[in-house]
Amino acid sequence: MNFKYIVAVSFLIASAYARSEENDEQSLSQRDVLEEESLREIRGIGTKIIGGLKTAVKGALKELASTYVNGKRTAEDHEVMKRLEAVMRDLDSLDYPEEASERETRGFNQEEIANLFTKKEKRILGPVISTIGGVLGGLLKNLG
């Protein structure tokens, strides 16, 4: 009788353990899906923000460029126009590539991924914004 009881309890414990392992695997796969969806949302928001900034800055730069085209240009004005054209090229190449593969992001949590995108934005936007500031400062100095 004791042997049957021990076998029955062992079987119940083994089946409960197997069910808990299966539930853990399902929970992990659901968590992976949620993390991937969050990552897509972060990328989408970043792309929309960058796209809006790019459009606004391009419009302002085109307006400034047309102002310079209509007036007489000195060597300094020509240099400013070259900088404006360089900024326009930088803005054209600023599009976010959707190349972040699952292998690259699988080991990161959401905060690390957000930090990576923030560092990338700072690395790209820093020089562009400083160049735009310098160009606008030069324009205001020349106009004033």
Swiss-Prot record:
Keyword Signal part of the UniProt annotation: yes
Compartments, as annotated in UniProt: Secreted
Sorted UniProt keywords: Amidation, Amphibian defense peptide, Antibiotic, Antimicrobial, Cleavage on pair of basic residues, Cytolysis, Fungicide, Hemolysis, Secreted, Signal
N-terminal signal peptide: 1-18
Keyword Magnesium listed: no
GO cellular component, one term: extracellular region
InterPro entries registered for this protein in UniProt: Bombinin
Residue numbers covered by the propeptide annotation in the UniProt entry: 19-43, 74-123
GO biological process, one term: defense response to fungus
Entry comment describing in which tissues the protein is expressed: Expressed by the skin glands.
Post-translational modification Asparagine amide, affected residues: 70
Modified sites of kind Leucine amide: 143
Function: Maximin-11 shows antimicrobial activity against bacteria and against the fungus C.albicans. It has little hemolytic activity. Maximin-H1 shows antibacterial activity against both Gram-positive and Gram-negative bacteria. It also shows antimicrobial activity against the fungus C.albicans. Shows strong hemolytic activity.
Protein family: Belongs to the bombinin family.
The protein's name: Maximins 11/H1
Native source species: Bombina maxima (Giant fire-bellied toad)
Lineage, highest ranks first: Eukaryota, Metazoa, Chordata, Craniata, Vertebrata
